[in-house]
């Protein structure tokens, strides 16, 4: 497949599996789950082996696909609304301030936003006024990240339940517009809680080209299954 593929399945509830191409005949394949889902870290190896054998995944993988290395797992911090953001002249950004999305585990966009916000705060307040710079940075994190974080955490809890998950996917599958914008929203082409924060509204906020322009090969495929993938 020349594009990103995402799988949802009952045993990955509040999580998902993915496949996306890399340069050459390579791909990144993996899955993520919430620690609160009841699945133990030690069970992830078993889930991984089973995931690779599922028909939906096999249909995307090349028949002769082989891993380059052993599979690995690591925790992703997602608590930007509960950790210190500064310590005098030190500003915490990215993973250091747990700025990741509670739904997807995505953290690259949050790292860029928090890093840029820290630099802008220092530039605005001046290098000799750390207290003022810290206050500017705190406000920027609240504006850009905290509302999105809390909204994503709320939605993640809804998706933990079968009725909520099925309802969300049915709504996303209504038409081409909802499918396209669900994929863009899920992977944060625009802020998670954009519709709830009018201060961030702008003309064309749902129609821009996004992080990557479509080269004609397709952008994203979302697959829903009522049984394991």
Name these PLM-found stretches.
Residues 1:
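FAD-binding core/adjacent interface of flavoenzyme oxidoreductases
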Residues 4, 100-103, 107, 153, ...:
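Residue-level detector of alpha-helix boundaries and kinks
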Residues 6-38, 92-93:
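Active-site substrate-recognition segment that forms the wall
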Residues 13, 35-122, 127:
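FAD/FMN-dependent oxidoreductases across multiple families
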Residues 33-52, 170-188:
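Short secondary-structure transition/capping segments
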Residues 120-229:
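C-terminal helical "tail/cap" subdomain of flavin- and related membrane-associated enzymes
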